[in-house]
Amino acid sequence: MENTLKTLYNNKICKDLQKKFRYKNIHQIPKLVKITINRGLGEAANNKQVLEKSMNEIAAITGQKPKITKSKKAIAGFKIRENIAIGLVVTLRRDKMYDFLNKLINLALPRIRDFRGISYKTFDGRGNYNLGLKEQIIFPEIKYDNVDKIRGLDITIVTTAKNDEEGLTLLKEFGMPFM
């Protein structure tokens, strides 16, 4: 089954970007490289159930088992010891990346309360976009009754764009609802 966003990129977006930015070579056209989903769980140091529930939530959202990130050094102020699980990360590529982006644009973002669009100011200067979500219940796979605590997650969309303008145009073409 061909992915709709991937087909859209190959058939329409490439041509539009090539016209707009006047690329001489098709390899200059920006494309998506990967999407990284990250969740920091400081409270997981004390409560292992938090880590398990978050792993299940992120696996349901992304369709891929998350990798546990561990602390590199002890920080007394945060009550964290070295080598303790404090977060989860998933890197999506190829078809899963396009599936997740489609779900994010068409299902999750419109479910945010008082949603008017996402900010275009969180590009990093190299065409990569960062998005922070405050609650995981906007995804259709997460049932509100099964959630013990509202936790957010960070999403990074990595592109081959040379600058923010190219990255913004690429994501707008995919249908990202910028304000």
From Swiss-Prot:
Coiled coil: none annotated. GO terms for biological process: translation. Keywords: Chloroplast, Plastid, Ribonucleoprotein, Ribosomal protein, RNA-binding, rRNA-binding. The keyword Transport does not apply. Gene3D superfamilies: 3.30.1440.10. One of its GO terms (cellular component) is chloroplast. GO terms for molecular function: rRNA binding; structural constituent of ribosome. It is found in: Plastid, Chloroplast. Part of the 50S ribosomal subunit; contacts the 5S rRNA. Belongs to the universal ribosomal protein uL5 family. Binds 5S rRNA, forms part of the central protuberance of the 50S subunit. This is Large ribosomal subunit protein uL5c. It comes from Gracilaria tenuistipitata var. liui. The gene is rpl5.
